[in-house]
Amino acid sequence: MALLQISEPGMAPAPHQRRLAVGIDLGTTNSLVAAVRNSIPEALPDDAGRVLLPSVVRYLDKGGRRIGHAAKEEAAIDPRNTIVSVKRFMGRGKAEVEGAANAPYEFVDAPGMVQIRTVDGVKSPVEVSAEILATLRQRAEDTLGDDLVGAVITVPAYFDDAQRQATKDAARLAGLNVLRLLNEPTAAAIAYGLDNGAEGLYAVYDLGGGTFDLSILKLTKGVFEVLAAGGDSALGGDDFDHLLFEHVLAQAGLEAAALAPEDVRLLLDRVRGAKEALSAAPQARVDVKLSTGEKLAQTITRDTFAALVEPLVQRTLGPTRKALRDAQVSAADIKGVVLVGGATRMPVIRDAVAKYFGQPPLVNLDPDQVVALGAAIQADLLAGNRSGGDDWLLLDVIPLSLGVETMGGLVEKIIPRNSTIPVARAQEFTTFKDGQTAMAIHVVQGERELVSDCRSLARFELRGIPPMTAGAARIRVTYQVDADGLLSVFAREQHSGVEASVVVKPSYGLGDDDIARMLEDSFKTAEVDMRARALREAQVEAQRLVEATEAALVADGDLLDASERATVDALVASLRALAPGDDADAIDTATKALAEGTDEFAARRMDKSIKRALAGRKLDEI
């Protein structure tokens, strides 16, 4: 009989084999994949030694496609079928992207997320992104020599629920198991913090091709705590390109609408090259021969470019101020500013950041790679490859408050913005009318006091509530945000146990500038919002009291004499007349008068109920 072999603790090969997991930065302009090898995170190159994969997909007829560098090189000759900057379309509706600057595509009017018509059929941003992710997955498996157990994919901190869900769908389509969606600034902080052993308050300024994020983090002995996040989900390096593009056209006396799609793409490519050249040189040339035979030849100086894009630079500082305010710190408290994203190579950006924070930004890690490196570290940890130096904790946040609609169109915030995730919060609500057997749950996102000023995320109904008097039912509504920033909502009637739930998957996400506008509006209109909320609350309470009093009069009006009945009727009529108005103080006064004027009536009703309950019963039965 063969003896069973038992290895010494920690020596058995199979259980302690490293599980292969990667970090992927799915970028607007470029994407890349990284992995931890020999305890060091590194970006994985392709066969030609190139780390960056252009986020470009060209569709050919009969199912053919080119991805990355090959597609980028052919973008000018086939612009309608070559999809670039697809990240800007993730989770967006057709109405939100039709104004996309100089986009040569034919957008298809389909329900939910925008679709793009190509020679190979209609494609969604999820499908296009999946092509890029599948290419990176194949690169990783070829380099590492085995299948992946999963990936951590980075997303802008200001991506909303729909955009995050679209990213997960693209990964699933690409054959990737998503271990975590990780906010890009947080990934950068992980890479920087672990690389440098940094501690203290840090700002991560992340300007990519299509999005801007600013996060304030506190690094303390391996704990990465995000204190606040701000940003603009529709601002990135592409916008700098388009401003310079429009400038070059204006100087030549041309308009974009008059150019052929291939000329638009060619000129954009040349303009982008000039922008990148200005990071190292005081001036750059734009030389283009259009399909009409006309030649454009211009010299762009760094000063001209800086003046041109100054409004965009200032747009990044607004969310920066808000994030600092939310974190309750000042620019002077920040120990270092980490730059992320290829667009931060522009001198105009580095100068603005240095001026605002009073110190030069940290640039010792490649801004194109730092996000993927941080994601790789997190992926390695989530895959179970923990080593002695991996005792660190990540605490990320949600960027906007999540709430529920209450009577009168008011918003009751369940999870406030900048709450650490994962998080679950619950609150109890009740019914508004007697005999109410259903409740509509309306999930909203934003900082304002009224539902009409916030973003609607989802609606669902809780049915089967036992009929009770108004206010007797107890409905517990629980909001749960997972580590990927995705929301689920549960409602439960406490007496009967009736339940309903929804995983929030809106058909498409927030429009351009919506999140930044929501926050800005909430600060500008806080006083107006509070007055509006006070009015709505007064109106709701007035309506509740009028209906309750009228129901009581129908049931027990005989408890009042003619004079008392006339007094109550007058108070009800007065409150009913005032309730639709806009004088909250007058409504409150009339509500208080009716409540006090019916105190004696309520006491008589209580006595009647007690007598009815005790009728025919002996003392020892009570």
Curated annotation (Swiss-Prot):
Domain of life of the native organism: Bacteria
Keyword presence, Lyase: no
One matching Pfam family: HSP70
Molecular-function annotations in GO: ATP binding; ATP hydrolysis activity; ATP-dependent protein folding chaperone; unfolded protein binding
GO biological process annotation, one example: iron-sulfur cluster assembly
Keywords: ATP-binding, Chaperone, Nucleotide-binding
Sequence similarity: Belongs to the heat shock protein 70 family.
Function: Chaperone involved in the maturation of iron-sulfur cluster-containing proteins. Has a low intrinsic ATPase activity which is markedly stimulated by HscB.
Protein name: Chaperone protein HscA homolog
Gene responsible for this protein: hscA
